[in-house]
From Swiss-Prot:
NCBIfam families: gimC_beta
Keywords: Chaperone, Cytoplasm
Subcellular location: Cytoplasm
Function: Molecular chaperone capable of stabilizing a range of proteins. Seems to fulfill an ATP-independent, HSP70-like function in archaeal de novo protein folding.
Origin organism lineage: Archaea, Methanobacteriati, Methanobacteriota, Methanomada group, Methanobacteria
Subunit annotation: Heterohexamer of two alpha and four beta subunits.
Gene name per UniProt: pfdB
Protein name, as recorded: Prefoldin subunit beta
A GO biological-process term: protein folding
Length: 121
């Protein structure tokens, strides 16, 4: 049985939104990993003596910097990453809600067309 044009269109939109949700999930994982790395770096810095020589990576080189300067820089980076994480989470919630709504709409459209969704028709 051929799917009605409107159902085909809704399914295509649903698949696009699924891809978007997957991309958002990858972004979220990346940001979470960066947050963890930054937190670990801050923990290590907090254990170092105040006059310890510390270095930061800049491309392929290491540059010696003051501990407090690097700590401040990493704190700012952490705050930025945490804001980004919250933004991504809100985006993810919106997309997941939209996916659920679309799934219901597609199922109703298929029932209206005499197709039993999920039964392999």
């Amino acid at each position: 049985m051929e799917l009605p044009q409107n159902v085909q269109h809704q399914l295509a939109q649903f698949q696009q939104l699924q891809q978007q949700a997957q991309a958002i999930s990858v972004q979220k994982q990346t940001v979470e990993m960066q947050i963890n790395e930054t937190q670990k770096a801050l923990e290590e810095l907090s254990r170092a003596a105040d006059d310890a020589e510390v270095y930061k990576s800049s491309g392929n080189i290491l540059i010696r910097v003051a501990k407090d300067e690097l700590t401040e820089e990493l704190q700012e980076k952490l705050e930025t990453l945490q804001l980004r994480e919250k933004t991504i989470e809100r985006q993810e919630e919106r997309v997941m809600k939209k996916l659920q709504e679309m799934q219901v709409n597609i199922q109703e459209a298929m029932k209206g067309a005499g197709i039993n969704p999920g039964m392999g028709n």
